[in-house]
Amino acid sequence: MSWQAYVDEHLMCEIEGHHLASAAILGHDGTVWAQSADFPQFKPEEITGIMKDFDEPGHLAPTGMFVAAAKYMVIQGEPGAVTRGKKGAGGITIKKTGQALVVGIYDEPMTPGQCNMVVERLGDYLVKQGL
C-alpha cells in the first residue's frame, strides 16, 4: 500500500459521518511522505520543536505548538509517543512511529477523541510493522 493510500483510506476515512480536516504522514525530518489536499505546510523549526517535545515531554507546553504558523495549545498526550494540541473548536494529534509522524488535524463536528482514534490506530499499526 502506498503512503498516499494510508492517508486517503485510513486517515481521511469517515468516522461517524465526519472526516479529519487534513492529514499527513511525514518523516521525522519533516519530509512529506503523503498528505491530504488541504494539509498545511510545516516550517522546519515547527518540526524541530515537535520532535524535541517527543524527546523532552513538556518542551512545547509553555510556548504552544505551531503548525504552519497556527498556534495550538498543547494538551495531554503520551510522552514520547503522542502529542496533542487544541485551537478553538479544532485541534491536532501527532503520533510518532520509528520513522514517521502521523498527523491529523480536525475541526468540529469531529471530536478530539475521534481524531485521536484515527491517527493513533494507524500509528500503532505502523509501529507494529517496524515503521
Swiss-Prot record:
The keyword DNA damage does not apply. It comes from the Eukaryota. SMART domains: PROF. It is found in: Cytoplasm, Cytoskeleton. InterPro entries: PFN (IPR048278), PFN_euk (IPR005455), PFN_sf (IPR036140), Profilin_CS (IPR027310). The modification Phosphothreonine is found at residue 111. GO terms for molecular function: actin monomer binding. Keywords: Actin-binding, Allergen, Cytoplasm, Cytoskeleton, Disulfide bond, Phosphoprotein. This is Profilin-9. It comes from Phleum pratense (Common timothy).
